[in-house]
Amino acid sequence: HGGLDIRGFSRALVSNLQGGDVQGASTLTQQFVKITLQENALKRGDKDAAKAAVDKTYSRKLQELKYALNVEENFTKDQILEGYLNLVYYGDQAYGVEAAALNYFGVSAAKLNLGQSALLAGIVQQPTAYNPVINPKESQARRDVVLDRMQSLGLASAKDVTAAKKVAVKK
């Protein structure tokens, strides 16, 4: 695992310097750092620091990268992923996987089934587009992509994936 995606960072930098669409190149660790900085600032009541944590500036991105490299040195991939999933936005005013599980399914994250877990994993990429409350078809399609990927990685059996896909996502 690495704190910097060199190819993505270079692509985004060139595009941004050429005046094209503003692009990001954040690794999951960089996103975790950004969310953590913003969350800590909000807890302190420091609105300026919360805004600065997400500003689209090169200086902020470099600071984020420095922190991300430090996080990578001091935490395992699993610890970083856990921290990220406990802070990230899942849509519908749900921040963190526990809040999302309760919000969308009425159960704690520990009690999610395979299909529900895959749906929440898929939401993170685009919380509004894949929100099952407002976009159930898109959410279901994304869930199915995640299920297929889980199967291809050996994290779920074909039987379990087929069963999970049979459950429709409803508003």
Where are the regions that the model predicts?
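Non-catalytic structural connector segments
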Residues: 157-171
